[in-house]
Amino acid sequence: MDDGGNDVDSAEDGDPCDASCPLLMSPSKLASNCFNSASARSSRVNVRGCDTSFRWGRPPPSLFAAKSSLARLSSASHASYLETGHIDLKKNEGLLFINNIFPRKLQWVLEGSLRASRPYEEALKRIDRPHLAASDPLRIIRRVFPHELEVEIKEVVPRFREGGAFVKYTRNEGVKDTDIETAVKDHLEKHPIRPWFNPFQQVKVASVLGRPWIEDLYRIPSPRLRVEFLPGSANDLANDPTTESLYSLFRSYGKLRDIERQPSDSKILPRYAYVEFARPKFAVMAKNCMHGFTIAEKEGGGKFGTRLKINYERKIKLSMIKDWILSHPRIVIPAVAALIAAITVTVFDPIRTFFIKMKIKATLHVEENSVLGWIRKQVSKANIIGLGVVASDPRGLTAIWEDRQGDISQLQSWLTENTETFIIIHGPRGSGKRELVLDQALENYKYKVVIDCKQIQDARGDTAKIARAAGQVGYRPVFSWMNSISSFIDLAAQGMIGTKAGFSETLDAQLSNIWQSTATALKGVILDSRKKNDKDAHLTDEEYLEAHPELRPVVVIDNFLHNASEDNVVYEKITEWAAGLTSANIAHVIFLTTDVSFAKPLSKALPNSVFRTISLGDCSLEVGRRFVLNHLADEARTGDKPPRSEEYLEDLDSCIEILGGRVTDLEFMAHRIEAGETPNGAVNRIIEQSTSEILKMFILSTNTEAQWSHEQVWHLIKMLANSKEGSLPYNQVLLSDLFKENGEVALQALEQAELISVSSINGCPETVKPGKPVYRAVFKKLTENKTLSSRLDLEILSRLISKENKSIGKYEEELRLLGSLPKQPRELTSRIQWLLQKVYNSQNKISRYETESAFLQMILRRGH
């Protein structure tokens, strides 16, 4: 710097900040000097009206001796600027705007710990260093003005957000503002000032031609200005300056990028134009210097001139984005839903697939842990050697598996073949389907997935169904609770745009996501075992899966078609997913079901495939006896009770014959025998429980949605109880009066409810049997109850009488129609005789039914 500047800087001896310019200080040092001061000064001197104001030409000797004599900002003067919004100029006073003296993007350095809502003027009161750049802008301004320029600086108004300051000065008579501006610019060219926060740019100065607006609003400078054209007089209209005029007015402040005028057909007033600079600092200079400037008439401003009103214009307004979003909900809401779905797929799907793999591999399960497995094996060996204990069979199922070894071998053979079809294990409840598949056939399979449809179907509501389906395959995280919230959002969106936005996913879509992620995990489990040096390394993934059916995981779908309805989304999605697994050679799929109509839903998924089916029935009496004896022997060996004597078990064969070969009933009897009951007592308990269940579910039930009637159920019970072979011909049942209308539907529903079972030959229904072997004894017990039997027989007779009366009514109506003819044609004679015979037969039936009904009523009145 020049000598004058050095003299001034060294005039204050005790000031540690005078040796170097505050503009060249680092941010940390500047902030430290500003905010670590002891206390704010108790008094400020207002330059306006102050006798100690100075000139830069010849400063008085005492100018820098006392800090109180420095011209500085006062809170009162700033309050007046913010209240009036303008800087008043008197005669011989001018105004300059100096740019790039405050860091616009580093205001936190100057504001310190102050809240953003407090004005900068409050910050100045808290700083005890008036010579610093942050507290006294005049210390910066004095380096801008050359020493030989005789001007008196009256006031400095900082514009922190814009990075500059207004300088109000007093000039001598005969000195023009343009001369002062030129002198300052020449001085800055010779002695450029580069602030510490932006050392690559210099401080710039321009004369203020308009009347700037001083405000403390939160308006961020931008390179784009909105220039509005206001009339110079209230009785006049503002002229619309040309592009050339605007260019000549604003080009001096910096490089212009574009000038965009208001469309000529626009009705918006006042008229405006957009002036865009190459950099924001040029726009800051232009706004502060040209705001309030009046274009003269000779320059195209009209008779009274055109005044400019300038504001910053953001290229993309947040309000514009908000307005567009609110005005286009049909586009925005579905787009947001799609974006959320895309983020979910991108972020969560790999995580969910990983957890499903963990579930399939079962690396966290105790039974799959190699270390614990080895320890368990060694302990088992020690027990065998030391105590002579053989492996126990707590349920005594060894006899059952020996009898069904052929089915187990057949199933294992199918799992090594490359056939794209389902494997169905069908059998009544309690026939041991799950144990046969999981404990025997798949005992040594490493990867298997078990899906229990009963748990999913019994869940209440879509949210619970989704959570249970996800839990069975390890699909997590699952935000099933979000579905309810999303449904409300969808409902609100439907009210706004008329259609659903897609925020909430239906049960169909959620299940599809779960099963699709499971399929991806199953495929990954197989392919993860591939190695580069395998002999099949040259095969593609699809070819590898097809070539190694023995490596595929096994998906077991238990309780298939449990509580199924005509249109069930759960079973529909499961069958579609299972068909995809088998078709893509990803996994073997085994269905375990008690429903005899399983072929119908499965054929929709694989219409051109023949399913491989294993039907599990009741075991033979010999196998049942061995099962019970093995169960009791194992209990005696592992427990404290002695084995039962032969005399105690003398009625075992007859009891097993009553129970048949149903595993669950045999096991229940074995448990009751272990508890101390005799075989006959255990069987009687089973019969009593089954009797109560049948009465509650089929006879005394008030369910109006059942597809059968109480009369139909009781008719079947009586006929099966009195049958010598324990079965009825299927067609004989359909020919009875109670089953003529909806006979097949009722029989299928009763079979589904497991009251009866229908045996087929070559796919055609042949015989009707009790649903369980023990049900034959139950049916006999029910028919032996005279009161119950009489009441239900009376209901059957009442229904038959009603049916015959309806038939007679139809016959009489037709006879009445034929009798109304003027002549009786000879051809109608046979028809009339047939109708009369029908009426006669129906009336005879009614008479017989009424006789039987009277007898039953008499029995009921007597109470036995």
UniProtKB/Swiss-Prot annotation:
Domain spans labelled RRM: 223-315
Keywords for the protein's UniProt record, in alphabetical order: Membrane, Mitochondrion, Mitochondrion inner membrane, mRNA processing, RNA-binding, Transit peptide, Transmembrane, Transmembrane helix
Mitochondrial intermembrane side, ranges: 352-864
Cited Pfam families: RNA12, RRM_1
Highest taxon of source: Eukaryota
One term of GO molecular function: RNA binding
GO biological process: mitochondrial genome maintenance; mRNA processing
Membrane topology: Single-pass membrane protein
One GO location term (cellular component): mitochondrial inner membrane
Compartments, as annotated in UniProt: Mitochondrion inner membrane
CDD domains noted in UniProt: RRM_Yme2p_like
TM regions (residue ranges): 331-351
Signal peptide, first to last residue: none
Function recorded in the entry: Plays a role in maintaining the mitochondrial genome and in controlling the mtDNA escape. Involved in the regulation of mtDNA nucleotide structure and number. May have a dispensable role in early maturation of pre-rRNA.
Family recorded in the similarity comment: Belongs to the YME2 family.
Protein name in UniProt: Mitochondrial escape protein 2
Native species: Aspergillus oryzae (strain ATCC 42149 / RIB 40) (Yellow koji mold)
Name of encoding gene: yme2
